[in-house]
């Protein structure tokens, strides 16, 4: 088996435009506020975790902006940071591949086109419409930017897409299809229809009078998730290739797990069956290391948090620290796995664990996992796990360990 390592990371979220946002996350700050990106009239939820002050011209030329939805722009921003962080500038990256990830893709662009149809303006539909919003164009733009001619894939497995993208990159490298991969999960789902759709499912928090305290993973008073946007990116390479070019190494990807609940289209299995299977598979593949920290899916919804806690406890007991950063940056859907993998890796590298903001206490029936209620310094963590679950009952988990020869 080839050893697969992480040599670069990047992210953009509601608390910042690069990996330095990790500091804001560990300080317990929250990026949730009233929505400014779209009209909120008639919506049951009027707040979200928006990326503030993002200027797409920092990533693409002005004339190119109209050719890509915001989710592509955010993804390119994170990808550029990971590319630079990995020291790939000036290196021939034609042997690299790309895996993009999203769940909703360019929904805002699509909504705008539908509005034009309703207004009778079909003749004014842009020729760039389709390539500006379809899901695989994130990976397409990344490969174009960096000249990466290896496999170009896209995962669209709802909220597990980012984690599945990491797994697909691992598999591609193991099979020798290329020497490096860049994984980019990105989402820009804050639109009227998207907010209304999730609201109709009673999936969103409705604490419009208190947005900062709305997302409260594992807390007994949680009432739904908070929509978020952003992107995360990781550069993965075979150890041989990374060493050959003298790359700095963040962590080693040692295990992954995938499963399906086969239970319900949106509700997780009541005993955490699929989640447990994915968690256990990732841990077993990694060689059963001592997991020191888990960045949980932790959506702040009634059932996910309850059943996920049960799965974690059954697999690992109360040994690992557990938190969910969705309390600060919202639920970024298909981007969550990539963003949270970056956060998990940085937590292990810097020995600082992100706290659960807004957490007070869990309901009595929740499994007694070791929740991180405040910023925690823990230097003894050698392995971390990040997991995500999506509609359709799809589950994915990955294990990263500190790198050593």
What is the role of each PLM region?
Residues 75-87, 135-187, 225-247, 332-353, ...:
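Active-site-proximal alpha-helical scaffold in enzymes
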Residues 1-64, 240-252, 342-356, 396, ...:
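ACP-dependent fatty acid/polyketide chain-elongation machinery
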Residues 6, 19, 29-157, 186-195, ...:
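Conserved beta-ketoacyl condensing-enzyme motif
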Residues 2-7, 29-34, 209-293, 405:
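Condensing-enzyme catalytic core mediating Claisen C-C bond formation in acyl metabolism
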Residues 119-126, 167, 171, 188-244, ...:
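Glycine-/small-residue-rich "gating" segment that lines the acyl/pantetheine channel
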Residues 177-223, 256-270, 296-305, 319-369:
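Acyl-CoA/ACP chain-elongation machinery
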Residues 1-6, 93, 286-290, 367-405:
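Flexible, low-complexity linker/loop segments at domain and module junctions
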Residues 8, 25, 79, 98, ...:
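Conserved small-residue
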